């Protein structure tokens, strides 16, 4: 429904999001067979290039990527590269999967401001390198992923602590005002 409405009313951002979400749901063989059987007419509608079922996920991910690039959303574009990479990985094309992940990291370095996104890309790079039998690159990417996860966890802990301190400060301010009012 979201895809249909976004196409009808020319909302490329939502069209791309819809295509990417459908692509992600079609990546698992069992899910793809069930979704295709249950939604044949809808699948035929989004399958404008008449791709075989096994390649439809990649086609939809590529179309989402093209739309996100045209829209100019760096973070969504990186996510679309990651989705396309997973589609390639699922059909055994590990070199293309790795190239997609490299593009996700290198096309626009602004994504480095989103460590969770970079961490998920590095995690996928580690998986792809492992599938290619490249232990050294797999370990390298896994270590970056783990470092980013640890840093992100520490950042969240610090943010939670700062919020607690801010709350305590507001309580103390209130108590000081109450004491001053009682004294006066």
Which ranges hold each PLM region?
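Hydrophobic positions within repeat-based interaction scaffolds
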Residues: 4, 25-39, 43, 51-58, ...
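Alpha-helix N-cap/helix-start positions at coil->helix boundaries
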Residues: 12-13, 74
């Amino acid at each position: 429904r979201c895809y249909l409405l976004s196409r009808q009313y020319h909302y490329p951002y939502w069209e791309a999001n819809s295509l990417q979400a459908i692509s992600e749901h079609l990546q698992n063989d069992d899910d793809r067979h069930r979704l295709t059987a249950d939604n044949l007419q809808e699948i035929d509608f989004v399958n404008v290039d008449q791709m075989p079922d096994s390649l439809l996920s990649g086609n939809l991910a590529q179309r989402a990527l093209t739309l996100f690039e045209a829209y100019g959303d760096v973070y969504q574009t990186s996510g679309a590269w990651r989705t396309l990479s997973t589609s390639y990985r699922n059909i055994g094309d590990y070199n293309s999967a790795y190239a997609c992940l490299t593009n996700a990291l290198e096309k626009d370095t602004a994504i480095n401001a989103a460590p969770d996104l970079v961490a998920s890309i590095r995690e996928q790079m580690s998986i792809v390198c492992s599938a290619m039998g490249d232990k050294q690159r797999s370990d390298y990417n896994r270590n970056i992923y783990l470092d980013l996860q640890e840093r992100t966890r520490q950042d969240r802990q610090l943010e939670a602590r700062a919020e607690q301190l801010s709350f305590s400060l507001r309580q103390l301010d209130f108590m000081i005002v109450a004491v001053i009012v009682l004294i006066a």
